[in-house]
Amino acid sequence: MGSLPEKDFPQVHRFITTHKEDGTPTFETKIPEPIEWERTNIGVDFFLAYTLGSFPAPLSHDADLNQYKDHLVNHPPFMIPGGAVVRYVDYHPGCEPMWHRTVTVDFGVVIEGELELEVEGGEKRLMKRGDVAVQRGTNHCWRNPSKTQFARALYIALDAKPVIVNGQELGESLGEVKH
């Protein structure tokens, strides 16, 4: 693909609240507020904004924070069974889409640029800044249509029960690239 242009997006910060031992609300200080991106070889950069291992979330004794700290070091799978994953994704200009289906309900919000969402049946939607997609267990892909600019999205993925269509359970499918 050659060299990438500079991202001109604002720095993202993560602010997490918690409680002091006396019950006073405060901000978590052991997890850095400025985020660090993970560059991949599939044309996207990831940032794991937060994870939950279960619902309802175990907030007492910072159990959820401790699990998230572990996930920052030992990256979780795409989805945590029974939980939730919040990710930022920066799409490189002209990156090839990766088709995938997860057993999740995903809320995808375009933060910067434009993204094309395509479902396996061939239908497409061009999403612009501020648009939201609710992805419900379909085989789909995301594409940055720009050849010169990055695009950024925020995803909130919640675990779901598998979709059953015509008596067939549609499970997870990751990594199939269609051109």
From Swiss-Prot:
Function in brief: Part of the gene cluster that mediates the biosynthesis of oryzines, natural products with an unusual maleidride backbone. The two subunits of the fungal fatty acid synthase oryfasA and oryfasB probably form octenoic acid. This fatty acid is most likely activated by the acyl-CoA ligase oryP to give octenyl-CoA before the citrate synthase-like protein oryE catalyzes condensation with oxaloacetate to form tricarboxylic acid.
Pfam families membership: Cupin_2
Recorded metabolic or biological pathway in which this protein acts: Secondary metabolite biosynthesis
Protein name per its UniProtKB record: Oryzines biosynthesis cluster protein J
Classification via InterPro entries: Cupin_2, OryJ/VirC-like, RmlC-like_jellyroll, RmlC_Cupin_sf
Organism lineage string: Eukaryota, Fungi, Dikarya, Ascomycota, Pezizomycotina
Native source species: Aspergillus oryzae (strain ATCC 42149 / RIB 40)
Cupin type-2 domain location: 88-148
Family label: Belongs to the oryJ family.
